[in-house]
Amino acid sequence: MQALIEISDKQYLVKKGDTLFVPRQQTAIGDTMEISSMATIDGANTVLNPAVSVKAKVLGHVKDDKVVVFKKKRRKRYQSRNGHRQQMTQIEVVSL
């Protein structure tokens, strides 16, 4: 069985035992999150049921890979290089 969930305006298709990285959540490491499901998929049957909830355990808070932003104006001796690392939360789906 799979479920379609939404966390911070992003949608994920998950099943039991999946680990995924989501945008930073304000929960402590080791806590369990309750996430409402948008749809459940069981084989060929799809049920749109917002009453179903997914439980996920928070494994840790990490930073994503660095994204480099480079700006340049030719012939003007202007260059700007900045880096950014997005804060992420790693979760594991415990039950559907």
From Swiss-Prot:
One Gene Ontology molecular-function label: rRNA binding
Superkingdom per UniProt: Bacteria
Region (Disordered): 73-96
Signal peptide annotation: none
Coiled coil residues, start to end: none
Residue spans of biased composition, Polar residues class: 85-96
GO terms (BP aspect): translation
Disulphide-bridged cysteine pairs: none
Gene Ontology cellular-component annotations: cytoplasm; ribonucleoprotein complex; ribosome
Pfam families with a match to the protein in the record: Ribosomal_L21p
Keywords recorded for this protein, A-Z: Ribonucleoprotein, Ribosomal protein, RNA-binding, rRNA-binding
Basic residues: compositionally biased ranges: 73-84
PANTHER family: 50S RIBOSOMAL PROTEIN L21, LARGE RIBOSOMAL SUBUNIT PROTEIN BL21M
Subunit (UniProt): Part of the 50S ribosomal subunit. Contacts protein L20.
Family: Belongs to the bacterial ribosomal protein bL21 family.
Protein role: This protein binds to 23S rRNA in the presence of protein L20.
Protein name as it appears in the record: Large ribosomal subunit protein bL21
Organism annotation: Chlorobium luteolum (strain DSM 273 / BCRC 81028 / 2530)
